[in-house]
Amino acid sequence: MTSYTDKGEKHARGRFLSFHHLTFWVGNAKQAASFYCDKFGFEPCAYKGLETGSRDVVSHAIKQDKIIFVFQSPLNPGNQEMGQHMIKHGDGVKDVAFQVEDCDFLFQKAKDHGAVVVREPWIEEDEGGKVKYAVLQTYGDTTHTLLEYLGPYRGVFLPGYKEPLFRDPLLPTLPSGCLSFIDHIVGNQPDNEMVPIVEWYQKCLLFHRFWSVDDKQIHTEYSSLRSIVVTNYEETIKMPINEPAAGKKKSQIQEYVDYYGSAGVQHIALNTSNIIKAVKNLKSRGIEFLSAPDTYYEELRKKLKTAKITVKEDLNVLQELKILVDYDDKGYLLQIFTKPMQDRPTLFLEVIQRYNHFGFGAGNFKSLFEAIETDQDARGNLTIYAANGEHQVL
């Protein structure tokens, strides 16, 4: 595991502030938004569709504290772009939007360094105010929207959006999701494509390396991965980039790439200030989490006896809820991962709480991999690499 201190070049003007929102392209935006509200504690915050004058695409925006997800679906049969995207990828994250200062400058800098432009800067406005956007291509079919508020914005979400048409009376009766903000967003790459993507972020967005692990550190009996985390100068946006490494069997990173059809967003980590309450509440709402074996907690108890930090939470409760712990000499983190959010074994979510710890759970990767491999095996996807490069199921 490596942590980096060199922040590299700072933008002469403008800066990346934070994650703003995520856009999912899905087959049925209304149902997808309702699922995340019911299961994770989001609430509808804005809508754009036929009733608001949007004739081609419907958008349902949902919010929990500082987290905003937007679910979009095509309204007409002829939408080839969205239709082909869903045939190839299934439901998934299409766009990761960053709030920025000086969109024009950051966009031009990225363009000058070779970034593929999806859409040049443009402005949208309504009675709430003005917002400037630009869109760049990143890994796979995923994009980044640069979003700049041109003065205070007083609308419900962004120009063109209106109040939700319906507020489900079920939602106020359910326990809080206790989720606060996007901690990090992980992108999975095919083999040998991690470093070029990391270099794209460094060159085009002036992000820098923050943390990394290689396959010598992250492996199970069967599979392994490499990961490099990139971040903006202010270190408010964290983007781990993963790739599979050669192993005896297909890794869960390769399984993702096979089923998604390309590189894409593997998981979204949501930060909480009370993971025990969050996990209890999310389980009661019907969220399925991966399960760590009891041997993990037996080993953890042994290791913590000689650790320089003290875990405040009751280890028996963490074990009961299957929450994982990672630590160093200065602090620790608590994390847990959901099962995939759709039938394809692609996107899943993470819930994470940090105590002066800025890593990404390297100490838990082996346990996480083994838990995923159990499910992978049940799907018939824990396959052996054959000499001809094909996969064989035992």
From Swiss-Prot:
Its subcellular locations are: Cytoplasm; Endoplasmic reticulum membrane; Golgi apparatus membrane
Q: Which reaction does it catalyse?
A: 3-(4-hydroxyphenyl)pyruvate + O2 = homogentisate + CO2
- Membrane topology note: Peripheral membrane protein
What cofactor does its activity depend on? Fe cation
Q: Which keywords annotate this record? A: Cytoplasm, Dioxygenase, Endoplasmic reticulum, Golgi apparatus, Iron, Membrane, Metal-binding, Oxidoreductase, Phenylalanine catabolism, Repeat, Tyrosine catabolism
Boundaries of every VOC domain copy: 18-149, 181-339
Organism superkingdom? Eukaryota
**According to its UniProt record, where is this protein mainly located?**
cytoplasm
- Sample GO molecular function, one term: protein homodimerization activity
Name a single GO biological process.
tyrosine catabolic process
User: What Enzyme Commission number(s) appear in the record?
Assistant: 1.13.11.27
Q: Is-annotated flag, keyword Repeat?
A: yes
- Asked whether the UniProt record includes Iron among its keywords, one would answer yes
Pfam family, any one: Glyoxalase
The family database entries (PROSITE patterns) matched by this protein are listed as:
VOC
Report the protein's function.
Catalyzes the conversion of 4-hydroxyphenylpyruvic acid to homogentisic acid, one of the steps in tyrosine catabolism.
Protein family: Belongs to the 4HPPD family.
What is the protein's quaternary organization? Homodimer.
Name used for this protein in its record: 4-hydroxyphenylpyruvate dioxygenase
The scientific name of the source species is Xenopus tropicalis
